[in-house]
């Protein structure tokens, strides 16, 4: 079939398998060009490995450090008549490229919050790898099914305390609007912490640890975003921020546990990037379009892959073997360039000036749109989008 982009809200409902494969190839090429990570991990589990920072982590481990990887994700395969999710095609492409280089690659398509997922991963590790030396936790899900009761809990992207009103961009109509978001209830805040906080990360490490499959010196990292006052009402000071603070709590507890065997647990605070997750957060697309333009001008721009490669090579797995630099809360900070005062001041000054008419001139909004559509495999140079393509792509994946 011939597949064209169809956008609904902040999701593109179609995906292009060849385009998704090209995205993965591009990240692999970038990783290889940067060179091998001297003290990199060798047996890595990535929970949430099909897109965004999780996918880049799997690529950094495999193609930057020759690591065996297990990826866990929840994606939909395509059929003969309907495309699957981008994450399915990303994972299929990763598996193909990893195997072509003789690297161990196993993927599990399942609910990562479930007990079954954890048991299956443990079984695989015992069978094939013995133990693992890194666990990346990179889940971004709006809903969590509690593993014991089966109850479905939903997260809320809302402020706390008062209604939040701010200038934003309507990405469907490409115009500047005033976005208003009502505050979260106490229940919504608690639910957001349940879905997006640190509990499941702890459950993963507990299960792996009790099964005896964590190597001494095993490192685990979970990803977070803090941002600045421009996005704080909806993010760090909102329901989502409470969940990310719970991630900090979990990191502290896990670090105490893992340090006994020379391991570590950290939250890595990353920069804002165009992902399916960030596009769903009010105000983020406009902020990203603004900050990207300034960072590009300053020569500081990083996408998911550049950011993760820097985390691996300059923080977690330094050539000199030293421990990573952390902030007062033991977080690894990779938002350091984005938070530079000149860059943030630029955004603060620009925010009130942006109109529908000057949006593309003052910000990198056009590039934002191009990167967004690229997440789904579209708008990539060298791909013939009028060519017939088969949306049914099979690969070595365990379905639970």
Swiss-Prot record:
Q: Which EC number(s) are documented for this chain?
A: 1.3.1.9
Q: Output the Gene3D superfamilies linked to this UniProt entry.
A: NAD(P)-binding Rossmann-like Domain
Q: Which reaction does it catalyse?
A: a 2,3-saturated acyl-[ACP] + NAD(+) = a (2E)-enoyl-[ACP] + NADH + H(+)
Q: Catalytic residues?
A: 235
**Per UniProt, what is the name of the gene that codes for the protein in this document?**
fabV
The EC category is oxidoreductase
What functional role does this protein have? Involved in the final reduction of the elongation cycle of fatty acid synthesis (FAS II). Catalyzes the reduction of a carbon-carbon double bond in an enoyl moiety that is covalently linked to an acyl carrier protein (ACP).
Positions binding NAD(+) in this chain are 48-53, 74-75, 111-112, 139-140, 244, 273-275
Please give the organism. Shewanella baltica (strain OS185)
Q: What is this protein called?
A: Enoyl-[acyl-carrier-protein] reductase [NADH]
MF annotations from Gene Ontology: enoyl-[acyl-carrier-protein] reductase (NADH) activity; NAD binding; trans-2-enoyl-CoA reductase (NADH) activity
Keywords in alphabetical order: Fatty acid biosynthesis, Fatty acid metabolism, Lipid biosynthesis, Lipid metabolism, NAD, Oxidoreductase
Q: In which pathway does it act?
A: Lipid metabolism; fatty acid biosynthesis
Which PANTHER family would you find in this protein's record? ENOYL-[ACYL-CARRIER-PROTEIN] REDUCTASE [NADH]
Please tell me where substrate binds in this chain.
Answer: 225
Q: What family is reported?
A: Belongs to the TER reductase family.
Q: What Gene Ontology biological process does one annotation of this record name?
A: fatty acid biosynthetic process
The positions annotated as site (Plays an important role in discriminating NADH against NADPH) read 75
Its subunit composition reads: Monomer.
């Amino acid at each position: 079939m011939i597949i064209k982009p169809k956008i609904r809200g902040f999701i593109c409902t179609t995906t292009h398998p060849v385009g998704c494969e090209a995205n993965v190839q591009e990240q692999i090429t970038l990783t290889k060009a940067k060179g091998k990570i001297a003290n990199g991990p060798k047996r890595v589990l990535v929970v949430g490995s099909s897109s965004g920072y999780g996918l880049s982590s799997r690529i950094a481990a495999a193609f930057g450090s020759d690591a065996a990887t297990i990826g866990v994700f929840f994606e939909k395969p395509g059929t003969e008549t309907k495309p699957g999710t981008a994450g399915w095609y990303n994972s299929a492409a990763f598996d193909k490229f990893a195997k072509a280089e003789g690297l161990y690659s196993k993927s599990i398509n399942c609910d990562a919050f479930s007990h079954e997922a954890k048991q299956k991963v443990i079984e695989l590790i015992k069978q094939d790898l013995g133990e693992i030396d890194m666990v990346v936790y990179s889940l971004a899900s709006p809903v969590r099914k509690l593993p014991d009761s089966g109850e479905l809990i939903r997260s809320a992207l809302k402020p706390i305390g008062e209604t939040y009103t701010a200038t934003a961009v309507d990405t469907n109509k490409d115009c500047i609007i005033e976005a208003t978001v009502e505050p979260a209830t106490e229940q919504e805040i608690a639910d957001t912490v349940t879905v997006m906080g640190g509990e499941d990360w702890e459950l993963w490490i507990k299960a792996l640890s009790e099964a005896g499959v964590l190597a001494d010196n095993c490192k685990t990292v979970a990803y977070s975003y803090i941002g600045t006052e421009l996005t704080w009402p909806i993010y760090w000071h909102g329901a989502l921020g409470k969940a990310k603070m719970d991630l900090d709590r979990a990191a502290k507890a896990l670090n105490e546990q893992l340090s006994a065997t020379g391991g570590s647990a950290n939250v890595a605070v990353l920069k804002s990037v165009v992902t399916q997750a960030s596009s769903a957060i009010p105000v983020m697309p406009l902020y990203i379009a603004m900050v990207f333009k300034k960072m590009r001008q300053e020569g500081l721009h990083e996408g998911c892959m550049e950011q993760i490669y820097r985390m691996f090579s300059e923080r977690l797995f330094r050539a000199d073997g030293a421990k990573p630099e952390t902030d007062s809360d033991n977080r690894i900070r990779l938002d350091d360039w984005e938070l530079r005062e000149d860059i943030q001041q630029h955004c603060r000054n620009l925010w009130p000036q942006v109109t529908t008419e000057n949006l593309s001139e003052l910000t990198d909004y056009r590039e934002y749109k191009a990167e967004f559509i690229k997440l789904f495999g579209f708008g990539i140079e060298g791909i013939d989008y009028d060519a017939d393509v088969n949306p049914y792509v099979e690969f070595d994946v365990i379905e639970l």
